[in-house]
């Protein structure tokens, strides 16, 4: 991902203020509610029958935390996301058969969640920087599909 030093600073500063566990749980929960067809990859998570069931599901919350911690780790590798996420891309492509569009959906939902959490502090400049990050991560995760 091509980012200026100023954009990288915006991203890391906001990430440092984010409750990653809560944001991860909310992000994955929202993906599963807003895009219900994504639930097919999480049948082993138990009850996903309603928005409340999804948002309160401990397995959804735990996996959302895991996903966002991985994204946070990727922030240290913005110049080489494809290499950093190569193993995860292979796992999601070859073993889990996840539709790569889901990575884009999750990234966009994360941006919405961050906007909600940070309010006015999530300026258009911060949003633009995060859109670059989530697009870069989605592309890296989809890399093995090509």
Curated annotation (Swiss-Prot):
<dbReference type="GO" id="GO:0031838">
    <property type="term" value="C:haptoglobin-hemoglobin complex"/>
</dbReference>
<feature type="binding site" description="distal binding residue">
    <location>
        <position position="63"/>
    </location>
    <ligand>
        <name>heme b</name>
    </ligand>
</feature>
<dbReference type="InterPro" id="IPR012292">
    <property type="entry name" value="Globin/Proto"/>
</dbReference>
<comment type="similarity">
    <text>Belongs to the globin family.</text>
</comment>
<dbReference type="InterPro" id="IPR050056">
    <property type="entry name" value="Hemoglobin_oxygen_transport"/>
</dbReference>
<dbReference type="InterPro" id="IPR002337">
    <property type="entry name" value="Hemoglobin_b"/>
</dbReference>
<dbReference type="GO" id="GO:0042744">
    <property type="term" value="P:hydrogen peroxide catabolic process"/>
</dbReference>
<dbReference type="GO" id="GO:0005344">
    <property type="term" value="F:oxygen carrier activity"/>
</dbReference>
<dbReference type="GO" id="GO:0019825">
    <property type="term" value="F:oxygen binding"/>
</dbReference>
<feature type="modified residue" description="N6-acetyllysine">
    <location>
        <position position="59"/>
    </location>
</feature>
<feature type="domain" description="Globin">
    <location>
        <begin position="2"/>
        <end position="146"/>
    </location>
</feature>
<dbReference type="GO" id="GO:0046872">
    <property type="term" value="F:metal ion binding"/>
</dbReference>
<keyword id="KW-0007">Acetylation</keyword>
<keyword id="KW-0702">S-nitrosylation</keyword>
<comment type="function">
    <text>Involved in oxygen transport from the lung to the various peripheral tissues.</text>
</comment>
<feature type="modified residue" description="N-acetylvaline">
    <location>
        <position position="1"/>
    </location>
</feature>
<feature type="modified residue" description="N6-acetyllysine">
    <location>
        <position position="82"/>
    </location>
</feature>
<feature type="modified residue" description="Phosphothreonine">
    <location>
        <position position="12"/>
    </location>
</feature>
<dbReference type="GO" id="GO:0043177">
    <property type="term" value="F:organic acid binding"/>
</dbReference>
<keyword id="KW-0597">Phosphoprotein</keyword>
<keyword id="KW-0479">Metal-binding</keyword>
<dbReference type="InterPro" id="IPR009050">
    <property type="entry name" value="Globin-like_sf"/>
</dbReference>
<comment type="subunit">
    <text>Tetramer of two alpha and two different beta chains. Two external cysteine residues at beta-16 and beta-52 cause reversible polymerization to octamers and most likely irreversible formation of higher polymers.</text>
</comment>
<feature type="modified residue" description="S-nitrosocysteine">
    <location>
        <position position="93"/>
    </location>
</feature>
<keyword id="KW-0561">Oxygen transport</keyword>
<protein>
    <recommendedName>
        <fullName>Hemoglobin subunit beta</fullName>
    </recommendedName>
</protein>
<feature type="binding site" description="proximal binding residue">
    <location>
        <position position="92"/>
    </location>
    <ligand>
        <name>heme b</name>
    </ligand>
</feature>
<keyword id="KW-0813">Transport</keyword>
<dbReference type="GO" id="GO:0072562">
    <property type="term" value="C:blood microparticle"/>
</dbReference>
<dbReference type="GO" id="GO:0020037">
    <property type="term" value="F:heme binding"/>
</dbReference>
<dbReference type="GO" id="GO:0004601">
    <property type="term" value="F:peroxidase activity"/>
</dbReference>
<keyword id="KW-0349">Heme</keyword>
<dbReference type="Pfam" id="PF00042">
    <property type="entry name" value="Globin"/>
</dbReference>
<feature type="modified residue" description="N6-acetyllysine">
    <location>
        <position position="144"/>
    </location>
</feature>
<keyword id="KW-0408">Iron</keyword>
<dbReference type="GO" id="GO:0031721">
    <property type="term" value="F:hemoglobin alpha binding"/>
</dbReference>
<dbReference type="InterPro" id="IPR000971">
    <property type="entry name" value="Globin"/>
</dbReference>
<dbReference type="GO" id="GO:0031720">
    <property type="term" value="F:haptoglobin binding"/>
</dbReference>
<dbReference type="GO" id="GO:0005833">
    <property type="term" value="C:hemoglobin complex"/>
</dbReference>
